[in-house]
Swiss-Prot record:
Gene responsible for this protein: rpsG
Organism annotation: Anaplasma marginale (strain Florida)
Pfam families, per the entry: Ribosomal_S7 (PF00177)
Protein name: Small ribosomal subunit protein uS7
Entry function: One of the primary rRNA binding proteins, it binds directly to 16S rRNA where it nucleates assembly of the head domain of the 30S subunit. Is located at the subunit interface close to the decoding center, probably blocks exit of the E-site tRNA.
UniProt lineage: Bacteria, Pseudomonadati, Pseudomonadota, Alphaproteobacteria, Rickettsiales
Coiled-coil region list: none
InterPro entries for the chain: Ribosomal_uS7 (IPR000235), Ribosomal_uS7_bac/org-type (IPR005717), Ribosomal_uS7_dom (IPR023798), Ribosomal_uS7_dom_sf (IPR036823)
GO CC annotations, alphabetized: small ribosomal subunit
Family stated for the protein in its record: Belongs to the universal ribosomal protein uS7 family.
């Protein structure tokens, strides 16, 4: 363990747009090699495409609902007890849950882009719409985490 003081978390600066801090965090996750302006263009284009494909919903509300649908509630943590490693189900903190959801959406869009011949913007739009409808790769990742936690419920008495 480090003897230094605890590291304070730096707040994410919002651009003052309608999406707020969550959208700013999403742009930071989408960003690659420090190209933030490109990431902002990709995200805003994907939200506009999602808004045009859906009926009556704004892009930001689609994004917020998609993220809340992908956020995991439970996950497993490894703990060594008496020479045996157990997978212990624990509840996920709010900030970790949000960041996992954002990462899963971006990861699903990137893998989909490699499989298909579409642009990253359209793949991101499709993944957001699928997460909005509780389908898609990102939702499968959430369900996989929950299934692992359910399978190891017997070890929940080894809480951290």
């Amino acid at each position: 363990m480090s003897r230094r003081r605890r590291v304070s978390r730096r707040p994410v600066v919002s651009d003052g747009g309608p999406g707020g801090v969550l959208l700013a965090r999403f742009i930071n996750v989408v960003m690659s090699r420090g190209k933030k302006a490109l990431a902002e263009r990709i995200v805003s284009g994907a939200l506009k495409m999602a808004e045009s494909k859906s009926t009556g919903e704004t892009g930001v509300s689609i994004f917020n609902t998609a993220v809340s649908n992908v956020m995991p509630r439970m996950e497993v943590r490894s703990r060594r007890v008496g020479g045996v490693t157990y997978q212990i189900p624990v509840e996920v903190r709010e900030d970790r849950s949000t960041s996992l959801a954002l990462r899963w959406i971006v990861k699903a869009a990137r893998t989909n882009r490699k499989r298909t011949n579409k642009t990253y913007m359209s793949c991101l739009c499709n993944e957001l719409l699928e997460a909005y409808n509780k389908r898609g790769s990102a939702c499968k990742m959430k369900e996989e985490k929950f299934r692992m936690a359910e399978a190891n419920k017997a070890f929940s008495h080894f809480r951290f």
